[in-house]
């Protein structure tokens, strides 16, 4: 069965700091699989751009079952030790519900602001993931990488999940797919079609070169959905799920095709105003989730 989650995107009014928590609680009540939060450091212009690790820590306190997905954390923004310790902390306080989505990012202004050369983002992501995996797996840890050196390091908070929280690697390039095969428990796409999912699966098998790592990977993606009767507040940054005028039937058909192509988890990104998010969740829960098999 395709596991369906919903994204808590940064469109919450600045003066309503509890809106995202209410929406997360509602998502759990409606039996969604997960909620997802992105990673922006500078104002996106959409509303409240909360830190994903901090916001999901708050979400973990008002939920008990819902999985918590960061989609995705820009790994080079954080020193490897800080990333590993923060993720392990959230893994512990959530009872093992964290899914750490990781990507290289793209925003040159944010890279300049954190003092990290954007040209190093791929190499830094690989370094930080390798270091984090080492810190999560053993204590003490020695590690030598191009950007991280550790000697007999003991992570302040060991994760509750053996080996650390599952890592979903975002990106469509060969470098991203190789990163998923090397470090990931899953691959995370954006706005994919069934043909693109099939293509990613084929490319992963080709790049795997017989190691068998591909067999452990979850294939997941964000999709863009504006339910009928609700106006879009911002343009969807990709192909709309169910077409330009979606119905329950067209959305279920699209999701079925994605599942047949190999997708096993899907996050609904809702380009709508904050006051309509719970109504949109209600529609998905009533009209879509019961038809997913």
Per-range role (PLM):
Residues 25-29, 56-65, 87-97, 181-182, ...:
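Acidic (Asp/Glu)-rich catalytic clusters
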Residues 2, 76-183, 198-207, 211, ...:
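Internal, glycine-rich beta/alpha segment that forms the wall or movable "lid"
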Residues 6-18, 73-81, 162-172, 235-249:
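Active-site mouth loops of central-metabolism enzymes
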Residues 4-8, 35-37, 68-71, 98-102, ...:
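Hydrophobic faces of well-ordered beta-strands that scaffold small-molecule active sites
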Residues 15-27, 82-86, 169-179, 246-258:
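Short, acidic/polar
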Residues 1-62, 165, 271-279, 283:
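N-terminal beta1-alpha1-beta2 module of alpha/beta enzyme domains
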Residues 21-38, 182-186, 257-266:
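Catalytic domains of carbohydrate-active enzymes, especially glycoside hydrolases
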Residues 119-160, 190-293:
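An alpha-helical appendage that flanks or caps ligand/catalytic pockets
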């Amino acid at each position: 069965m395709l596991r369906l989650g919903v994204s808590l995107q940064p469109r919450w009014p600045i003066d309503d700091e509890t809106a995202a928590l209410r929406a997360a609680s509602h998502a759990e009540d409606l039996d969604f699989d997960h909620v997802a939060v992105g990673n922006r450091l500078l104002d996106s212009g959409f509303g409240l751009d909360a830190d994903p690790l901090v916001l999901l820590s708050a979400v973990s306190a008002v939920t008990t079952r819902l999985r918590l997905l960061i989609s995705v954390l820009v790994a080079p923004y954080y020193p490897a030790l800080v990333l590993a310790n923060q993720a392990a902390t959230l893994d512990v306080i959530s009872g093992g519900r964290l899914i750490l989505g990781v990507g290289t990012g793209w925003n040159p202004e944010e890279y300049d602001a954190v003092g990290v050369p954007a040209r190093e983002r791929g190499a830094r992501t690989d370094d930080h993931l390798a270091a984090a995996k080492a810190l999560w797996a053993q204590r003490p840890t020695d590690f030598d990488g191009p950007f991280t050196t550790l000697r007999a390091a003991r992570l302040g908070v060991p994760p509750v999940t053996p080996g650390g929280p599952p890592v979903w690697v975002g990106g469509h390039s060969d470098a991203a797919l190789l990163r998923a095969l090397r470090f990931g428990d899953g691959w995370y796409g954006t706005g994919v079609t069934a043909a693109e999912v099939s293509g990613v699966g084929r490319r992963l098998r080709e790049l795997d070169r017989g190691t068998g790592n591909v067999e452990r990977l979850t294939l997941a993606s964000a999709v863009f959905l504006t339910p009928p009767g609700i106006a879009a507040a911002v343009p969807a940054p990709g192909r709309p799920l169910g077409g330009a005028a979606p119905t329950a039937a067209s959305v279920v058909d699209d999701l079925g095709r994605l599942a047949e192509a190999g997708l096993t988890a899907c996050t609904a990104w809702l380009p709508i105003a904050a006051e309509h998010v719970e109504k949109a969740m209600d529609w998905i829960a009533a009209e879509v989730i019961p038809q997913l098999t």
